[in-house]
Amino acid sequence: HEKKLGQLFCDDSAQQIIDMLVDECEGAGAELRLNTAVTDIRKTANGFTVHTDTQSGTHTITCQSLVIASGGLSIPKIGASRFGYDVAKQFGLPVTAVKPALVPLTFQHEFLHRCRALSGLSVDAEVRYGKTVFREGLLFTHRGLSGPSILQISSYWDEGQALEIDLLPDIDVTALLKARKSETPRQDVLTALADCLPRRLAADILDELSVSGRLADLPDKLLARTGQRINRWQVSPSGTEGYRTAEVTLGGVDVNALSSRTMEAKTQPGLFFIGEVVDVTGHLGGYNFQWAWSSGFVAGEAA
C-alpha cells in the first residue's frame, strides 16, 4: 500500500517480500545454497572461481559472471558483513566511507533524561539539517529521537552538528501565545500550549524554560522564547543507534566504478555489484528495495 506519494509498504509483513523472492528463484531454476561461507574468489580466463566452505566440506564454483548482492552493514544479527566491500577492494574498485543511515539518533545527559520521560510520545514535526528538510512523525524514545523524520534526516546529518526541529510546523507559536494573551489573558500558558501539543510534551518544554502561570503575567519576551523553543528547537545528537537498528548503510562501492546501465565493474568484466553494497541510499518507503530490484534486474540481464 502507498503511505505517502511514492512510499510503498507491505500490507502484512516483510515475509511477503521473502516469499515472493523465493518463489521467483524457484521458478527461474536458481539453486539456493545456505550456510555457505565464501572463502576465496579468483579471476580466470573464462570468468571466476568461487571457493566455499560448508559443513560437508569445501567446494568450488565456476562461473562466467559474478554478481555481488551481499548488502551493507545494517542489522548484523541477520548476517551483515563487509564481504561485498572486501571483494570490491580485492578487484581494485574504490569503496566510499560507510556509516549507518535511516537510523534513530541518540543523546546524552539532561536531554536524554527528558527523552526518556517522554518515551513513546509521537508528534508531527519538521526536522532540518542545513538545506535538507523532512516533515513526518517524530518519536521520543528511551535512547533519544526516532520516527520517520529523524530516520530520514540521519542520512544527511554529520556527527557533532546540530539539528533544528519545528514541533508545530503549521503554527507560529510566538504569535499564537501573544494572541491568546490578548484574547484570554487569564488562561494558563500550559493550557494554551496543550491545545496544540500533547500536554506531557508542553509541560516538559515549559518546565525546561521555567515558564508557568497565566499568560497575562508573562512578558512577551518570555512568550517569544517559548515560541522559539517549539518552532526552532536546536538539538545536538551524540550519535546514532548504529548498524544494530539502521535500515540501510550509507556509502559502499563507488558508483563511478560501475556501469550505470549494467552495474558491471568497468575494470573487471563479468563482475557486478548491486543493491545496498553500492553507494546508493534512498529515502524511507521502499526506495532502497526498488534500487535493489532495479540494479539487480539490469545486472541479471547483462550477466
Annotate each language-model stretch with its function:
Residues H1-E31, T36:
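Conserved N-terminal/central alpha/beta ligand/cofactor-binding core
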Residues L34, A203-T281:
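A glycine-rich dinucleotide-binding beta-alpha-beta segment and adjacent secondary-structure elements
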Residues L34-G47:
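A conserved short coil-to-beta-strand element within the FAD-binding core of flavoproteins
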Residues Q55-S65, V133-E136:
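Core beta-strand elements of the Rossmann-like FAD/NAD(P) dinucleotide-binding domain
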Residues S65-F111:
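Glycine-rich loop(s) and the adjacent beta-strand/alpha-helix scaffold that form part
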Residues I75-P76, P104, T141, L145-P148, ...:
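Glycine-rich phosphate/pyrophosphate-binding beta-alpha loops
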Residues G84-F91, Q290-A303:
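An active-site-proximal "capping" alpha-helix that borders the catalytic cofactor pocket
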Residues L93-K99, V103-K221:
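An anion/pyrophosphate-binding glycine-rich loop and adjacent beta-alpha core
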